């Protein structure tokens, strides 16, 4: 019985760790979080970016990720994001950002549009990653943490 209980505790702990960075919304006013891989011809089906010549820089539109979300307000808020490198078990790798990123470590989300003629007012935010100002240098698992008002502890969504 003790053995079964200890196995269940270990499995539960590992599930909680792996779910720590699952794609999701963490704020009650944020809705419709979408992440998709796009190119000029539409949405791609592959769930990964390709490391070419030791870098992912966003210069190839077919190797970028588009993230969008809605916030239930007509007040344009200041959202930003940062990127965190993770191990294969989705735990933080411990690498410093300069070891896996070239350029800035955070970016503001300044592409937004207010809803028009809708019963519920909302603001749609979107951005693409990577881009010229933030490029990936190493392969691995990553999570993009979207936060509000420059406060990296105030995460509203993660992809």
Predicted segments, located by residue:
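Bacterial Sec-dependent N-terminal signal peptides
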Residues: 1-24
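Contiguous beta-strand segments within globular domains
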Residues: 35-85, 124
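Ligand-binding face of N-terminal immunoglobulin V-set domains in extracellular IgSF glycoproteins
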Residues: 113, 119-149
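Hydrophobic or amphipathic alpha-helical targeting/insertion segments
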Residues: 20, 138-139, 152-154
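Extended low-complexity, serine/threonine- and proline-enriched intrinsically disordered segments
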Residues: 75-104
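Short beta-strand elements
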Residues: 29-34, 44-50, 152-159
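Sec-dependent signal peptide cleavage junction
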Residues: 18-41
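Extended, compositionally simple fibrous regions characteristic of intermediate-filament-like scaffolds
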Residues: 98-108, 112-123
């Amino acid at each position: 019985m003790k053995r079964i209980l200890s196995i269940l505790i270990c499995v539960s702990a590992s599930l909680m760790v792996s779910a720590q960075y699952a794609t999701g919304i963490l704020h009650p006013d944020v809705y419709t979080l979408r992440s998709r891989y796009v190119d000029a011809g539409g949405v791609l089906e592959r769930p990964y970016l390709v490391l070419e010549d030791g870098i992912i820089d966003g210069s190839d539109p077919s190797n970028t990720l588009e993230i969008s979300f809605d916030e239930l307000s007509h007040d344009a808020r200041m959202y930003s994001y940062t990127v965190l490198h993770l191990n294969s078990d989705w735990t933080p790798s411990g690498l410093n950002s300069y070891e896996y990123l070239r350029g800035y470590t955070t970016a503001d989300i300044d592409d937004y549009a207010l809803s028009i003629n809708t019963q519920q007012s909302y603001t749609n935010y979107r951005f693409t990653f990577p881009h010229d100002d933030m490029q990936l240098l190493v392969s691995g698992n990553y999570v993009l943490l979207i936060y509000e008002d420059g406060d990296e502890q105030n995460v509203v969504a993660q992809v």
